[in-house]
A protein has these predicted regions:
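Hydrophobic/aromatic beta-strand patches that form the interior of the parallel beta-sheet core
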Residues: 20, 61-63, 144-148
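Metal-dependent peptidase/peptidase-like ectodomains
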Residues: 22-135
């Protein structure tokens, strides 16, 4: 939906925004790693020369949306999963504190946090330094990089908070209206941030 918004003819930005869908995340971030390996050296190269076209723009930052809708809390003592969204549900914004671009990534994370406070209608955001095991990782040493998700990837998803992670249950019918609204708030957070970062504006009719 964000791609649809930014591709509208009445939306103008001073910087390019590229939306990418990665495959094979489960088997080792293969799609994202291949993109970095194959495209990193092509940044900012005009092709064909004199055309004014740059098939691979210079990378300024990477904002990843991972699993975005299930925040029901930790498993119960018997191992069962809470049916309903937890009252403390929030949008997690993670950067990797051990990356070569950690300072710029942290700045980007807090910029998104500010966007959440301004534009998200229902759910707050939390910033954390442990981005891991996600398609933004291949970019983390190159450019400011963050990952938005429903739970902290390491301590919460890794502890079984999301029963739909890499499972066949990750389908539309699994999620409630509240779950979808959490995902919407992540989209609102990123939409607002991108609009400012790319100096976006609406063209007057």
């Amino acid at each position: 939906e964000l791609a649809r918004v930014f591709s509208s003819p009445d939306v103008k930005t001073e910087r390019s925004i590229r939306f990418a869908l990665w495959n094979n995340e489960e088997t080792g971030l293969n799609g994202a790693r291949a993109y970095v390996d194959q495209r990193q050296s092509l940044q900012g190269i005009e092709n064909p020369k004199g055309s004014g076209k740059y098939p691979e723009p210079k990378w300024l930052g990477m904002i990843q949306h991972d699993m975005m809708m299930w925040d029901h809390g930790m498993p119960n003592a018997d191992g069962s999963i809470p049916k309903d969204q937890r009252p403390e549900a929030d949008v997690n914004i993670e950067f990797q504190m051990k990356s070569k671009a950690t300072l710029a990534s942290q700045q980007l994370a807090w910029f998104l946090h500010g966007s959440n406070e301004k534009y998200a209608t229902d759910y707050p955001a939390q910033v954390g330094p442990h981005m891991t095991n996600t398609d933004s990782a291949p970019f983390q040493d190159l450019i400011p990089t963050v990952s938005l998700r429903e739970n902290e990837r390491g301590s919460q998803v890794g502890a079984g908070w999301d029963p739909n992670w890499h499972q066949v249950s990750d389908v539309f019918s699994t999620y409630s209206d509240k779950d979808f609204r959490l995902g919407l708030n992540a989209a609102q957070t990123t939409l607002g941030a991108l609009l400012h970062l790319a100096n976006g504006s609406l063209k007057k009719p």
